[in-house]
Amino acid sequence: MSTRLTTLSHTSEGHRVSVHYGYDDKGRLTGERQTVENPETGELLWHHETGHAYNEQGLANRVTPDSLPPVEWLTYGSGYLAGMKLGGTPLLEFTRDRLHRETVRSFGSMAGSNAAYKLTSTYTPAGQLQSQHLNSLVYDRDYGWNDNGDLVRISGPRQTREYGYSATGRLESVRTLAPDLDIRIPYATDPAGNRLPDPELHPDSTLTVWPDNRIAEDAHYVYRHDEYGRLTEKTDRIPAGVIRTDDERTHHYHYDSQHRLVFYTRIQHGEPLVESRYLYDPLGRRMAKRVWRRERDLTGWMSLSRKPEVTWYGWDGDRLTTVQTDTTRIQTVYEPGSFTPLIRVETENGEREKAQRRSLAETLQQEGSENGHGVVFPAELVRLLDRLEEEIRADRVSSESRAWLAQCGLTVEQLARQVEPEYTPARKVHFYHCDHRGLPLALISEDGNTAWRGEYDEWGNQLNEENPHHLHQPYRLPGQQHDEESGLYYNRHRHYDPLQGRYITPDPIGLRGGWNMYQYPLNPIQVIDPMGLDAIENMTSGGLIYAVSGVPGLIAANSITNSAYQFGYDMDAIVGGAHNGAADAMRHCYLMCRMTKTFGSTIADVIGKNHEAAGDRQGQPAKERIMDLKNNTVGIACGDFSAKCSDACIEKYNTGQLFGLDGIKADNPIKAKQGSSDASNY
């Protein structure tokens, strides 16, 4: 009996919202379908479906977005990405070095040496991203790093940005250098990471900490929170000495029982300027938004529009892949295993309507009865007809299908006349040119021209935009989508305020996401939070992203890292030494052992060295890094020669082959039975 989840359903803002899953005979996900219905009439308001397929090695190498041709990932080895096809047409090619790191990325109708878009990447000896050079010089970037693994400089043809950090690794300042320009922006925070008044602009400020991590005011707004710590009101701040005219605007935020933003309004002079309502599925993903804007009616009065602007959203797992309005549909294909957008496909709704057709099964069911009411075929018959239709359209009808038709007294020619002709809608395809984090900087057309470009600060605020073709580009930092009506960025589980560089509600996973439950990563240059839950570290250090590229790489590396920390916690409960002691040494050993088994000793060594470089901090013992690297070396050897990493690292501890600041003596050796209950989980 199958115990796989097939359907989830709930009511959101008066709508029945459901998610349906399909699986193959091996239990792998083959499809996800999202629906929104009017609960009173049963009318289907929104439908979105994504299909998945796998190759013989079990890698997810094919995805079929809703109403688009299949996307095929071309891979080699254990899943390293070599290219991408859309509906059989090659769009992207990747060249990699001997460590499987991406060195060249080409896009366009002639992908390869004559590609319209060609991005070349180089790396430092430590595996950090060193440069990204494009065949259009305006987007060239060179990266500079310090000895601690911090990104301290990004240089381009137009400007250079230099980054300063605190002793705890927080972004402390940004200096922008360009011809006739030298600007330094400081970022002051309290110990918990909350923004404080700029000491250069407000030298008289005595504020040193925000109680409960709730910012009450800044240079632009006054804020109010409810008993749950959720932002409920934001009002324009009137500077001291300015005469009040009661024209300040107030933003109001309302939430459901799951602390999700469901209603937003902006009011001025007691009248609403804009209102919006948000709809979520059972997994908390936003499925739709409705926006009413203030406009002049037929009588000349200004009031909210009667008919809202409706936007529908479609998802593939936790990644937003479809944005549909009343006029167009925008679909995004991401880099495998990441939140970095790769390809943008836009289709006008009129073109989509022309492409709508009945399947062969639907045609036969609708025309299969004399009374005109149609018939319902069994599911197995529908599958047979769907397969037959694919074969007819490809002009490759199998002998099996011909034999089946003969048994039914039918011919291929008879069924072919029932197949409705296909219409291929006109689509605009663009490539996302992103920064090292995955924030889009430009949209490149297939002929290599820039159709859109944007400039952002380190926290995702848009500083400048060139948009001659009026393209809608809502994506910001990985996992974020800009809402024009509120100025907020929807970030999967929460909403992010880019002006404050933090979330407007506490972290739904509590302290697992950090001590400050409003905090976005305090080093947004190298750390991202695509889920609105917790940070993903070492995004540019070479520790993960640039060492373990490929379809399974990032996911596998993150999973191994999490397992290593859990292994360390369990060993600490037995022998202690979670910091610079026995448990810490076993954690390093286990981490490198698992990385070696998964990626090989060369890449494991790169990951280990850059993990230590990124973790260096002011005031740490001088021997700490040497100790960790020695334990890493032991772990790499275990990965090459041992069957099970947990057992191997416990044995290294028991025999005194691991390293601590003050030495490690196995005065309390871990017995086989004592460690097996914990170690068996790894």
UniProtKB/Swiss-Prot annotation:
Membrane-traversing stretches: none
Annotated coiled-coil segments of the chain: none
Xref: Pfam families: DUF6973, RHS
Region (Disordered): 348-372
Bias kind Basic and acidic residues: ranges: 348-360
Task performed by this protein: Rhs elements have a nonessential function. They may play an important role in the natural ecology of the cell.
Family: Belongs to the RHS family.
Name of the protein in its database record: Putative protein RhsE
